[in-house]
């Protein structure tokens, strides 16, 4: 018995004594041979060194790089779309007078970048309605759903089986019974609370569903990164929606924890709808293992808007791309700003490039305004956000907390001329790790409308002054520094 005990003890001693060595070897192999930011590399090495077992678990949850996985290699869109893009590039390079209308003067380089990096066509015949209240947004959406004649494409990161989706679900089942093609694409992590049997039941009712990046064991979803954070609805190619609202009762102010939910969502009519349709179909093809590009009728029926037109590009980013297109648009817009920058975001964890660009803008006399929530929905991210906000406050930016519920709006307005709004937060996760989609709108009227909304929000905000920030308690400072130190792991 004692000999067996000694053998076991020797084995345990050997394992413990070599654990650090093998852990560091593992860390070098998996971290250095994947493309990532140097700060992220060192953060992972320190975590794996000091907390070997727990660090490994965290790496499984957050750390792996998916850039080179075949599962994210998405093919280019149909040839005729690429042809239109090449023609726009030629006109921009030759400074074609028709192409360079007043709205995009000064932003030709950004338009060109979006054409080259993301095949984002510039469309000029778009109507845009801006929703900042969930009840108004979903009333409009459900009315558009009831008017569908050919197809309904719905994609959300979070769909909860509650009072809101019950209303939407009834409409979808009714339209499917009328012969309308209905597709619902949802993220496995965001919708993990919904039972698989529910989606199966919807399929039986004629509503096609597909799950993005499912786990082998549904209740054991280990992949926190690389989630599909997009929120897109396309109806008959006549109207599309994109923005920050998911589907759940909290988004229509029925959750006691958050109270009023302040978000931003766009309703679009015009040729930009095609950009969102293509984006949905690319994601659907991957999740459903289907090729809807073989269905040309799904790309017909685009109609111009009927009111004041605006120029727009639909841009997207994710781990399937070699460029961080949304990040680069934010960075370029900040660098091009001459008068003012307005930012709303629930999470403010910028990389060094964007943080430095914002600080340079402040020191150059540009008015920089940043609005964040007054309450956390994810405490770790909130305290990291507050740390970076502190940098901006000390640099001279105008920073505010929204105190009338929870702020989930995501976007930026520059010089009252251009706005970039959609699903992407101002953080590392949205820039590099998740699948996102934004609309870049080159239009003074819509940009000024969004500035006016921002100014109205200020009535229920509290400004974070230098004195207020410096006087924060030691406990809060410690939280900030710990969370900021770990923020590269996001």
Language-model features: locations:
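Cytochrome P450 I-helix active-site segment
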Residues: 205, 367, 371-378, 385-386, ...
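Thr-Gly-centered strand-to-loop micro-motif
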Residues: 343-345, 402, 421-422
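Histidine/acidic-residue-rich catalytic or RNA/ligand-binding cores of hydrolases
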Residues: 353-355, 382-384, 414
